[in-house]
């Protein structure tokens, strides 16, 4: 039984027929059914498998497009990390096209030809839930390489689950005079409702703008009318499946992008490029930093667990204005006494931490806990990793609330919620 075979799988829950697809888990059989949906079946639940028809060997070779460079257009490098923005499924064989070249991108989204000269390659091929700091370092290094080779802008195709973490990491690690745009798709490009093409077009439009910094581009509403440009340290995935899942947190989107008219309307000021194409990276990250959610009845021993594992930093995702139950105070003190930097965010996501309002917050401050202003928890996590990777703990405590790359807005916007 090979990828591309048409199979019939019998389980206690019914019979499933379709094309056998590559699976990322050896314990799961994945098939594409006639209705276009993929189904994963645990092997332990399979009663019988029958091969209905043998599939064809996947054929990936296509003639080159031989596109000439347009000197009037900017050059944008699109780097894939394994997202689905330009992925294609061969329905005859069930195979997923593994390459990610400029030709592949233009075949998938020919509108790109009128926007920029496109370079494209895959730097890794992972599901975004498997992202980790060593991959952030790899992406940063590849961005530097592309800019040094002349790219006017960078687009990172990324899975949506952890895109905000990667956007935060790149915001701190990469200092570049070109725009770096992360883009993803909530619906894969083999589905009629896919948002991949419009998101990618909008991302390339943003990447050719005379701005610098790290941003995320995704659908602005559930239809197909516009996309938003979000600051990389002020964005979060707020819905598991909607196409407009990404929202700016404690801020408003940077810009509204119309992929049809190519119009970009800026909603707030951004840092302009000076056309120098300078790029520097600092990939020093302290990976022993934990993010712990506070909840009623929690066992404070989890804090001691990380301390005893020699973790250097802990981000608490507290309640309300930045609170935690008094019965874990002794464990927090254990951490700070050991020199662990402990900071506080809020699980409300929107709003800011203010530990001076109630006695609980004031007591936490006496224990050495530092409030993180209006940073989302994942941004605070990545920032603490970056700071601990580059500074001594006492300096980290001073810098955690210093705005480094736009992660903090000291004045709360009424229109940001």
From Swiss-Prot:
GO MF, one example: asparaginase activity
SUPFAM superfamilies: GatD N-terminal domain-like, Glutaminase/Asparaginase
EC assignment: 6.3.5.-
Reactions listed under catalytic activity: L-glutamyl-tRNA(Gln) + L-glutamine + ATP + H2O = L-glutaminyl-tRNA(Gln) + L-glutamate + ADP + phosphate + H(+)
Enzyme type, top EC level: ligase
GO BP field: amino acid metabolic process; regulation of translational fidelity; translation
Active site as annotated: 84, 160-161, 237
Keyword entries, A-Z: ATP-binding, Ligase, Nucleotide-binding, Protein biosynthesis
Sequence ranges assigned to domain Asparaginase/glutaminase in this UniProt record: 74-403
InterPro entries xrefs: AsnA_fam (IPR006033), Asp/glu_Ase-like_sf (IPR036152), Asparaginase/glutaminase-like (IPR006034), Asparaginase/glutaminase_AS1 (IPR020827), Asparaginase/glutaminase_AS2 (IPR027475), Asparaginase_C (IPR040919), GatD (IPR011878), GatD_N (IPR040918)
Assembly and binders: Heterodimer of GatD and GatE.
Function summary: Allows the formation of correctly charged Gln-tRNA(Gln) through the transamidation of misacylated Glu-tRNA(Gln) in organisms which lack glutaminyl-tRNA synthetase. The reaction takes place in the presence of glutamine and ATP through an activated gamma-phospho-Glu-tRNA(Gln). The GatDE system is specific for glutamate and does not act on aspartate.
UniProt similarity note: Belongs to the asparaginase 1 family. GatD subfamily.
NCBIfam families associated with the record: asnASE_I, gatD_arch, PRK04183.1
Protein known as: Glutamyl-tRNA(Gln) amidotransferase subunit D
Organism per entry: Methanocaldococcus jannaschii (strain ATCC 43067 / DSM 2661 / JAL-1 / JCM 10045 / NBRC 100440) (Methanococcus jannaschii)
Name of the encoding gene: gatD
């Amino acid at each position: 039984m090979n990828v591309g075979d048409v199979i019939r799988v019998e389980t206690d829950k019914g019979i499933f027929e379709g094309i056998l697809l590559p699976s990322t888990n050896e314990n799961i059989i994945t098939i594409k059914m006639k209705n276009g949906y993929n189904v994963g079946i645990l092997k332990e639940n399979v009663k019988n498998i029958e091969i209905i028809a043998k599939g064809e060997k996947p054929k990936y070779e296509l003639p080159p497009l031989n596109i000439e460079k347009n000197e009037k257009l900017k050059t944008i490098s699109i780097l894939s990390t394994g997202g689905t923005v330009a992925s294609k499924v061969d329905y005859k064989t069930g195979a997923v096209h593994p390459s990610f070249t400029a030709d592949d991108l233009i075949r998938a989204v020919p509108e790109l030809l009128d926007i920029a000269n496109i370079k494209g390659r895959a730097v890794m091929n992972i599901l975004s839930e498997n992202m980790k700091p060593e991959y952030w370092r790899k992406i940063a290094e590849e961005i530097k390489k592309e800019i040094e080779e002349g790219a006017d802008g960078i687009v990172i195709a990324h899975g949506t689950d952890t895109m905000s973490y990667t956007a935060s990491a790149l915001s701190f690690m990469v200092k570049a005079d070109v725009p770096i745009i992360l883009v993803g798709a909530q619906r894969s490009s083999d589905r009629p409702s896919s948002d991949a093409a419009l998101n990618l077009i909008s991302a390339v439009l943003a990447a050719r703008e005379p701005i610098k910094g790290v941003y995320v581009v995704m659908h602005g509403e559930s239809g197909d009318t516009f996309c938003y440009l979000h600051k990389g340290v002020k964005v979060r995935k707020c819905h598991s499946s909607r196409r407009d899942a990404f929202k700016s947190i404690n801020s408003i989107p940077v810009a509204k992008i119309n992929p049809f008219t190519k119009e970009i309307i800026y909603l707030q000021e951004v840092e302009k490029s000076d056309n120098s194409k300078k790029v520097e990276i600092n990939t020093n990250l302290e990976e022993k930093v934990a993010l712990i959610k506070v909840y009623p009845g929690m066992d404070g021993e989890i804090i001691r667990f990380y301390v005893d594992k020699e973790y250097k930093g802990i981000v608490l995702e507290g309640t309300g204005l930045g609170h935690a139950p008094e019965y874990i105070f002794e464990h927090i003190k254990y951490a700070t006494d050991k020199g662990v930097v402990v900071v506080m965010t809020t699980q409300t996501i929107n709003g800011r931490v203010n530990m001076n309002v109630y006695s609980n917050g004031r007591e936490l401050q006496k224990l050495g806990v530092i409030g993180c202003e209006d940073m989302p928890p994942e941004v605070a996590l990545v920032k603490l990793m970056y700071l601990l990777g580059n500074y001594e703990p006492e300096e980290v405590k001073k810098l955690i609330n210093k705005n480094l790359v736009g992660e903090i807005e000291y004045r709360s916007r009424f229109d940001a919620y």
